[in-house]
């Protein structure tokens, strides 16, 4: 009994399609996951088993093998729970396979079968649109973020049983839609404003010139003179984000799980890392590469408060991202490029 469900994984700030192949054969009960899964993916077998049982379905007491293709790329995160569960039910004949190849599925499962939000929903929705899928099934918590992508049906699911009934044509999942114009008009607001600064005319003039030309700026002054306050208000006088800029910035925040309740990042980011930050924390890195502060400040402002306190090697690694507007992290298996076009403000 073999079934194939389509899902997606993130590489850099973009996503690619992953084929979740489920094979159920006779033998002693076992659950094996292959295709370079990380710890969260390997642990999904226990979540999937409990979710299927607690949703009212029978978990097959046989040998189950799950392959995540392409098998030469590292798969991470809990977003494969939902496609694995649907694949197991499809292999046992409990899910109609006719519509499976037309939809991407992503989502983490709780033990009671509820579908929980996952990281990277926006780039995955873009991958679904670019590869010509009819739609993508996402957790309810990711639906508004994914619906920012035009040209693909975004279907929100709150429970595994809903997804099963959708593929069996006994339940409809209504598409989620959002108005980009309304999102920008509501969310493109700052809690602080540049006009709150009284006095400091020469500094304000320098910041206005810096904002107009996209120039980096260094502020020097005694403690308490307002350097940090002025830097925090600099994004409020920068031009508003275009939709393309907002989409690119949102992709970075989406894969880091920093979206919260927002559907899109509609304001210029402001990042102020502590002076004890490492070079990997600043430009990105790690065993499984992740974006750093320079990428989280993409299309916004990176503020280096107490710049002399930063370690020399940390300041040195800023040179290439500032010059190129991107940072490339090379590992033995792959090379990943993150965007890092920002205004640097130091004090």
Segments (PLM) and residue ranges:
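P-loop NTPase nucleotide-binding/switch module
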Residues: 171-209, 213, 240-295
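Helical "lid/switch" subdomain of P-loop NTPase nucleotide-binding domains
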Residues: 230, 234, 290-293, 306, ...
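Walker B catalytic acidic pair
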Residues: 299, 305-307, 317
């Amino acid at each position: 009994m073999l079934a194939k469900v389509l899902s997606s994984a993130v590489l850099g700030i973009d996503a690619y399609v992953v084929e979740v192949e489920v094979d159920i054969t006779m033998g002693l009960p076992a659950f094996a996951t292959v295709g370079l899964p990380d710890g969260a993916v390997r642990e999904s077998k226990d979540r999937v088993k409990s979710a299927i049982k607690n949703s009212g379905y029978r978990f097959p007491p046989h040998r189950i093998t799950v392959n995540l293709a392409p098998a030469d790329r590292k798969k991470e995160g809990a977003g494969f729970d939902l496609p694995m569960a649907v694949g197991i039910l499809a292999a046992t004949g409990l899910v109609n396979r006719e519509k499976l190849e037309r939809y991407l599925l992503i989502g983490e499962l709780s033990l009671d079968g509820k579908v929980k939000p996952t990281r990277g929903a926006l780039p995955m929705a873009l991958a679904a649109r670019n590869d010509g899928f009819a739609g993508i099934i996402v957790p309810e918590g990711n639906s508004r973020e994914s619906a920012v992508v035009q040209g693909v049906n975004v279907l929100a699911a709150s429970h595994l049983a809903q997804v099963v009934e959708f593929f069996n044509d006994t339940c409809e999942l209504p598409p989620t839609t959002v108005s980009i114009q309304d999102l920008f008009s509501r969310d493109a607001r700052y809690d602080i404003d540049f006009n709150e600064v009284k006095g400091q005319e020469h500094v304000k003039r320098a910041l206005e010139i810096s904002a107009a030309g996209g120039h980096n700026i260094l502020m020097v002054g005694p403690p308490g003179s307002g350097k940090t306050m002025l830097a925090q208000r600099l994004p409020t006088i920068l031009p508003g984000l275009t939709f393309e800029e907002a989409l690119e910035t949102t992709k970075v925040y989406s894969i880091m799980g920093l979206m919260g309740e927002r559907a899109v990042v509609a304001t210029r980011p402001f990042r102020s890392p502590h002076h004890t930050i490492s070079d990997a924390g600043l430009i990105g890195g790690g065993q499984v590469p992740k974006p750093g502060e320079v990428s989280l400040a993409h299309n916004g402002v990176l503020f280096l408060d107490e710049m002399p306190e930063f370690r020399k090697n940390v300041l040195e690694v800023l040179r290439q991202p500032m010059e190129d507007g991107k940072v490339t992290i090379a590992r033995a298996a792959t090379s990943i490029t993150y965007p890092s076009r920002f205004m640097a403000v130091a004090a």
